[in-house]
Amino acid sequence: EQMTKIPRESGNEAAISEYLVNFAKEHNLDYVQEPCKNVIITKPATPGYEDAPRVILQGHMDMVCVKDDELDFNFETDALPIYVDGDWLRTKGTTLGADNGIAVAMSLAILADETLEHPALTVLVTTEEETGMDGVMALDPANVPGDILINIDSEEEGVALASCAGGV
């Protein structure tokens, strides 16, 4: 819900990038914020998982920005008009930003949960995916330690792809 209050149109990711940096600081996690505003957050393995392969959870912070024509809304400055409908989070006349806010929210929830047992984790959140993969193209691989990468940006719920280059 907090992320829906931060405008994050492609090319306008400075505020959401800072939000991620502040999250890392608040949780005493190591992080790197790249010049292109990509954010990489790392968390050590829990006891017993130190020798397991490091997992990278990857998503992007920008969102598809579409609204109803008659709606007075500015994606560069306005918080999304969200509301709860039963078990669903919805908006009034705009896209929700679940592409790919869901990856960011899931990754932050995993990082914040002190009860989960896990290997060393790297959370990679890139910029400008919706307009040309600019964040990925500017990424410094030296900033992204890991052995297994899970990209959390799928078109279908419950479907996983292995060894897929996607849009690259």
State each model region's role.
Residues 1-87:
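Acidic/His- and Gly-rich active-site-bordering loop/insert found
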Residues 31, 162-165:
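Short Gly/Pro-enriched turn/cap motifs at secondary-structure boundaries
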Residues 49-125, 129-131, 137-147:
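Active-site metal-coordination/substrate-binding segment of hydrolases
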Residues 139-162:
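A glycine-rich helix N-cap at a beta->alpha junction
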